[in-house]
C-alpha cells in the first residue's frame, strides 16, 4: 500500500501539482495518465524516492518491498542476465552474495558457520530455493531465450535489455510495483503476456503508458495528472475518458447557464436601477447576482496536434501487389515468399514475433532496402509516405526546426511553416530549436508533419 499526503512538487516557479492526497491499495493497478510534461514520470520518481518533493510525504505499508522498472540500460553490463533479474529483490540478493562469499572461504570458522546458518534461514524465508527458476520463468515469458540467461548484459541487444529490466522489476512479486512505459520495445505477444501477468497481480501496481489499449486491459483505476492536481478515478482509461469528458461538458453547460442568468440580471438592474417602483425587484436581483457563481474551468495541460492527411490524388482500385518477397539478415531468414495484395480502403496490420521482420518489409516497400527475392508493384496512382521505426538519421543536422521542415515543403515561407508547426504544437521560439536536441516525442511530431506535407495517399507506419 502507498499513502501520499499533501504532496507538492515545484521546479523554479512552475508547480506541476499540489495538495495531492491519495492511497493506492493492494489488488489494484493504477494507470497514471496525463499530457507530456504533466509530471507522470516525476510522480513515479517521487514515489520511488529518487526525487524529493517540495512538500508532503510518501508512506509504504510496514515491511513492504518496492520495485521500480529501471531506465538505465547500461547499469548491469558486467552482470549475467539471470543475476540482473535476481538483483530485483535486493534483500535476497544480498543474502545470496554474503552466503556464497562465506562458503568460498578456505578458512571456514565457527563464526562463519553461525552466520551461514542465519543466512540460510533468511534465504529460505524469502523463497530463495525457487529464486533462479522464478527468474528464468519471467525471462522466458518476456521472450528471453534460455541460452541467453547466462550471457552478460553488455552482450545482448538494447531491446533484450528492456525485457530483462522488466523481469527484474517483476521478480519476487514486490508489494508495490512502479512501471514507467513497460511496453516500449515489446512485441504484441510479449505485451499480451504482460497484460495477463498484471491482470492477475495481487499487489499494488502503478503504471505509466501511452498505450491506451494496454491501460484498458490492466488498470482498475486511473490517476489523472492535469490542471495542476492529481485525481483518482475508478475504472480503466476508456471509462476515465468518458467520465472526464462528461464532467467537462456538464461544467461548461452549468457555466453557460450561469453566464446567461448573470447577463439577464445585469440587464434588469441596469434598466430599472433608477425606477423607484422597481427598487425592491432591483435589490432582489442584485442579491441574486452576488450569489451567482461561475466556476473557473482551468486550462488543461492536454493539447492535441492537428494531424490531417490530405491526399493530392485519389487512389485507384489496385494499390499494391507483392509477390514472393524474401529477406534475410546475417544468414537469418526474416520472411520468405511473402505474397499479398492491397486494395482501395484496406488497412493492414503486420504482426510478427520478430520486429525486425516487420521493419525490413516496410523498408523494402518504402524503397529503402532491396529484397533478396521477389518483387512488388505500386499502383500508378500511388504516392506513399513512410514513418520509419528509427528516425535518428533525419535529425543529424544543425538545422532549426523551421529550416528542417522547409526541406519537405513546396511553400518555404516562414509564415506557412510557422503555422504548420503550430498545428503540431510547436509555437513561439520553439521553431528555432535545433532539431538534433528535440525529444523523442517532438521528433515524432516532426516526422508526422513531414508526412502530411507529402500529400500522400498511402501511409506506411512502423510502430
Predicted regions located by residue number:
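ABC ATP-binding cassette signature C-motif
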Residues: 1-255, 309-463
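Intracellular alpha-helical coupling/juxtamembrane segments of multi-pass membrane proteins
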Residues: 243-296
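Short low-complexity stretches enriched in small and charged residues
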Residues: 25-26, 277-280, 301-302
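Short, flexible cytosolic linker that couples an ABC transmembrane/permease module to its adjacent nucleotide-binding
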Residues: 298-314
Amino acid at each position: 500500500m502507498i499513502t501520499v499526503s499533501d504532496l507538492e512538487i515545484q521546479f523554479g516557479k512552475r508547480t506541476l501539482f499540489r495538495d495531492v492526497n491519495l492511497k493506492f491499495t493492494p489488488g489494484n493497478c493504477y494507470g497514471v495518465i496525463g499530457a507530456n510534461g504533466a509530471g507522470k514520470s516525476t510522480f513515479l520518481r517521487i514515489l520511488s524516492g529518487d526525487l524529493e518533493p517540495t512538500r508532503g510525504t510518501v508512506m509504504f505499508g510496514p515491511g513492504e518491498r518496492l520495485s521500480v522498472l529501471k531506465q538505465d540500460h547500461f547499469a548491469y553490463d558486467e552482470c549475467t542476465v539471470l543475476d540482473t533479474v535476481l538483483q530485483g529483490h535486493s534483500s535476497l540478493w544480498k543474502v545470496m552474495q554474503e552466503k556464497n562469499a562465506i562458503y568460498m572461504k578456505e578458512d571456514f570458522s565457527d563464526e562463519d558457520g553461525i552466520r551461514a546458518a542465519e543466512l540460510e534461514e533468511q534465504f529460505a524465508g524469502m523463497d530463495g530455493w525457487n529464486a533462479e527458476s522464478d527468474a528464468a520463468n519471467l525471462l522466458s515469458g518476456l521472450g528471453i531465450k534460455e541460452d541467453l540467461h547466462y550471457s552478460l548484459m553488455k552482450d545482448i541487444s538494447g531491446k533484450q535489455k528492456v525485457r530483462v529490466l522488466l523481469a527484474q522489476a517483476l521478480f519476487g512479486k514486490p508489494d508495490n510495483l512502479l512501471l514507467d512505459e513497460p511496453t516500449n520495445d515489446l512485441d504484441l505477444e510479449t505485451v499480451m503476456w504482460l497484460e495477463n501477468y498484471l491482470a492477475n497481480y495481487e499487489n499494488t501496481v502503478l503504471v505509466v503508458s501511452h498505450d491506451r489499449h494496454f491501460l484498458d486491459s490492466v488498470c482498475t483505476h486511473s490517476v489523472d495528472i492535469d490542471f495542476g492536481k492529481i485525481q483518482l478515478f475508478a475504472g480503466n482509461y476508456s471509462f476515465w475518458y468518458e467520465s472526464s469528458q462528461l464532467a467537462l461538458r456538464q461544467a461548461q453547460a452549468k457555466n453557460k447557464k450561469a453566464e446567461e442568468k448573470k447577463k439577464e440580471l445585469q440587464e434588469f438592474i441596469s434598466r430599472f436601477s433608477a425606477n423607484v417602483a422597481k427598487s425592491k425587484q432591483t435589490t432582489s436581483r442584485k442579491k441574486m447576482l452576488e450569489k451567482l457563481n461561475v466556476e473557473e474551468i482551468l486550462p488543461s495541460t492536454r493539447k492535441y496536434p492537428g494531424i490531417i492527411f490530405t491526399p493530392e490524388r485519389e487512389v485507384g482500385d489496385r494499390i499494391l501487389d507483392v509477390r514472393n518477397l524474401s529477406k534475410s539478415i546475417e544468414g537469418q531468414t526474416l520472411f520468405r515468399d511473402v505474397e499479398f495484395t492491397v486494395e482501395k480502403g484496406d488497412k493492414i496490420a503486420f504482426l510478427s514475433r520478430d520486429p525486425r521482420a516487420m521493419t525490413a518489409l516496410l523498408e523494402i516497400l518504402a524503397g529503402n532496402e532491396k529484397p533478396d527475392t521477389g518483387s512488388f508493384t505500386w499502383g500508378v496512382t500511388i504516392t506513399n509516405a513512410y514513418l520509419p521505426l528509427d528516425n535518428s538519421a533525419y535529425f543529424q543536422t544543425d538545422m532549426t526546426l523551421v529550416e528542417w521542415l522547409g526541406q519537405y515543403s513546396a511553400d518555404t515561407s516562414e509564415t506557412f511553416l510557422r503555422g504548420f508547426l503550430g498545428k503540431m504544437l510547436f509555437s513561439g521560439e520553439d521553431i528555432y530549436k535545433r532539431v538534433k536536441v528535440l525529444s523523442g516525442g517532438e521528433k515524432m511530431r516532426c516526422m508526422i508533419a513531414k508526412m502530411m506535407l507529402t500529400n500522400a495517399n498511402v501511409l506506411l507506419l512502423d510502430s
